[in-house]
Curated annotation (Swiss-Prot):
Main location: plastid
GO biological process: carotenoid biosynthetic process; farnesyl diphosphate biosynthetic process; geranyl diphosphate biosynthetic process; geranylgeranyl diphosphate biosynthetic process
GO cellular component, one term: chloroplast stroma
Protein name (record): Geranylgeranyl pyrophosphate synthase, chloroplastic/chromoplastic
Organism of provenance: Sinapis alba
EC number(s) stated in the UniProt entry for this protein: 2.5.1.-, 2.5.1.1, 2.5.1.29, 2.5.1.10
Cofactor binding, note field: Binds 2 Mg(2+) ions per subunit.
Function of the protein: Catalyzes the trans-addition of the three molecules of IPP onto DMAPP to form geranylgeranyl pyrophosphate.
Binding site for isopentenyl diphosphate: 112, 115, 144, 163
Reaction catalysis annotation: isopentenyl diphosphate + dimethylallyl diphosphate = (2E)-geranyl diphosphate + diphosphate; isopentenyl diphosphate + (2E)-geranyl diphosphate = (2E,6E)-farnesyl diphosphate + diphosphate; isopentenyl diphosphate + (2E,6E)-farnesyl diphosphate = (2E,6E,10E)-geranylgeranyl diphosphate + diphosphate
Lineage, top ranks: Eukaryota, Viridiplantae, Streptophyta, Embryophyta, Tracheophyta
Length: 366
C-alpha cells in the first residue's frame, strides 16, 4: 500500500490479471501518479511439478471435507457471545455517562462479529490459545464500530439505520457520535497494549499495535474512505476494476486483514503463516464488499437491517454498477476460491473455521 492518496484524476490503472490482487507500490512515483503492482495470491509450494497436481487435489479435498463437516453457525454464535461479554466488560457504563452510553450503544448493538471471529480463528490456526487473542479481537471490533459510527454521519453516508436500530448520531447527536467514535478508536489501542497476556512477548504486542494502526490510517481505512467519497458520481468510462479494488482493499479489507494478522502475531505464527493469513483476509475482505454491493441492490432494508439501495441513491461506485450483477457474482466466487487456496497445507481441523468463514461471507444474506 502506498503512503498517500493522490487526486482521482491522476490515477493510472494497470491491467488486471485473474490470479492477482492489485495493491499500491511502495516505490516513489511522481505526485500525480499512482502505480499498482500485482501481489500473487498463490501460496508457494516446495513440491515438484510432477507431484504438485495430486498433492493440491488431495489438500483441496481435505479442505472441502473439513469445511463441510464443520458447524460454523454454532462456532460463530459461541465465539460472538464470548466477544460480546468481553466488550461489555471492557467498556463499562461509567462517568461521563453520556459518552459511555453512546460507545456502548453501537459497540453492543450486535452484528456478525466477523472480525473478532477471524482474529480468534487465525490465532488458533497457528497454535495459539483463544484467550491470548481476546484483547486483540475486542480492539478490532472497537475500531470497526468506530468506523460505522463515523461512516453513518451526515457528512459521510448520512444513514439513519444500522444493525436494525437508529444510527448513533440519530440517538445522541452528531457531536457525541463523533466523540464516541474517537473514544472507541483510542481505547482500542489502550486495550490491546495493556490487556494482552504477558505470555505474548512485548515485541509481538508492539508489532500488533503497528499493524492495527496501519490498517486504519492513510495506508488503510482512511485511504479507502477518501477515495470512495471522491469517486461518487464518476463516469464509469473513466474508472475500472482496479480503482474499485483500491477503495475496498483499503476501506473494507484492511481491517479484516489486520484481524487475521493480529491473530497470527498474537498466536505465535511464523512470518510465512502470517503472510498467508494476510492474503486470505485480503481476499475475503474484497469478497465481503462484493457481496455487500450485491445485497444492497437485491435485498430490502428490513432484510439487511440497514438502508438498502443507499449506494445507488448516492451514485457510489459499486461492483454491480461497474460489472453488472452476474459478473459481480462470478467475481465473488473467484475471490472465495483464491481465499481458500491460501489455506492449503494447514491442519485441516484448525483451518475449518476460516474455510467456513469464507463460505459464510460468500453466501450471506444480510
Amino acid at each position: 500500500m502506498a503512503s498517500s492518496v493522490t487526486p482521482l484524476g491522476s490515477w493510472v490503472l494497470l491491467h488486471h490479471h485473474p490470479s492477482t490482487i492489485l495493491t499500491q507500490s511502495r516505490s516513489r512515483s511522481p505526485p500525480s501518479l499512482i502505480t499498482l503492482k500485482p501481489i500473487s495470491l498463490t501460496p508457494k509450494r516446495t513440491v515438484s511439478s510432477s507431484s504438485s497436481s495430486s498433492l493440491i487435489t488431495k489438500e483441496d479435498n481435505n479442505l472441502k471435507s473439513s469445511s463441510s463437516s464443520f458447524d460454523f453457525m454454532s462456532y460463530i454464535i459461541r465465539k460472538a457471545d464470548s466477544v460480546n461479554k468481553a466488550l461489555d466488560s471492557a467498556v463499562p457504563l461509567r462517568e461521563p455517562l453520556k459518552i459511555h452510553e453512546a460507545m456502548r450503544y453501537s459497540l453492543l448493538a450486535g452484528g456478525k462479529r466477523v472480525r473478532p471471529v477471524l482474529c480468534i480463528a487465525a490465532c488458533e490456526l497457528v497454535g495459539g490459545e483463544e484467550s491470548l487473542a481476546m484483547p486483540a479481537r475486542c480492539a478490532v471490533e472497537m475500531i470497526h464500530t468506530m468506523s460505522l459510527i463515523h461512516d453513518d454521519l451526515p457528512c459521510m453516508d448520512n444513514d439513519d439505520l444500522r444493525r436494525g436500530k437508529p444510527t448513533n448520531h440519530k440517538v445522541y447527536g452528531e457531536d457525541v457520535a463523533v466523540l464516541a467514535g474517537d473514544a472507541l478508536l483510542s481505547f482500542a489501542f489502550e486495550h490491546l497494549a495493556s490487556a494482552t497476556s504477558s505470555e505474548v512477548s512485548p515485541a509481538r504486542v508492539v508489532r500488533a499495535v503497528g499493524e492495527l494502526a496501519k490498517a486504519i490510517g492513510t495506508e488503510g481505512l482512511v485511504a479507502g474512505q477518501v477515495v470512495d467519497i471522491s469517486s461518487e458520481g464518476l463516469d464509469l468510462n473513466n474508472v475500472g476494476l482496479e480503482h474499485l479494488k483500491f477503495i475496498h482493499l483499503h476501506k473494507t479489507a484492511a481491517l479484516l486483514e489486520a484481524s487475521a494478522v493480529l491473530g497470527g502475531i498474537i498466536g505465535g505464527g511464523s512470518d510465512e503463516e502470517i503472510e498467508r493469513l494476510r492474503k486470505f483476509a485480503r481476499c475475503i475482505g474484497l469478497l465481503f464488499q462484493v457481496v455487500d454491493d450485491i445485497l444492497d441492490v437485491t435485498k430490502s432494508s428490513q432484510e439487511l437491517g440497514k438502508t438498502a439501495g443507499k449506494d445507488l441513491i448516492a451514485d457510489k461506485l459499486t461492483y454491480p454498477k461497474l460489472m453488472g450483477l452476474e459478473k459481480s457474482r462470478e467475481f465473488a466466487e473467484k475471490l472465495n476460491t483464491e481465499a481458500r487456496d491460501q489455506l492449503l497445507g494447514f491442519d485441516s481441523d484448525k483451518v475449518a473455521p476460516l474455510l467456513a468463514l469464507a463460505n459464510y461471507i460468500a453466501n450471506r444474506q444480510n
